[in-house]
Amino acid sequence: MKELIERWVDSGDIQIVEREVDPRFECAAVIARAQRESDRPILFRNIKGSALPVASNLFGSRQRLSEYLGAGDGHFCQRWATLMKNPVAPPTVVPESDGEFRSASLDELPQLTYFEKDAAPYITSGIFLANQPDTGVPNL
């Protein structure tokens, strides 16, 4: 994922927000406005109270999702099925070869509050594969 986001940064295919953004309502408001104007992903580099960035709308287009999975145009479902039948083990990373490692907690991840009635901040990414009933076009 990191390499893909870096590629989008290099190519200008991702919107970048450098200013500090509050994870309580403000980040969600910026995301909502940006999604009305474009399907490009968004990278927030300065989240109030966190040393970590937030990325949003990473899978906002079929083209980007297909690129991420290494699927050609119109072959997303075939590629997805192949990947599910033949999972690849994640690489083993040796700490000395990939920079600094330290103990971490999920609490360090920035968690957004989207709406006033949300019970608490949360991390989103619920995704499932379905076909549009009338056209049969697959979508996530």
What are these regions (language model features)?
Residues 1-140:
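Extended, highly charged
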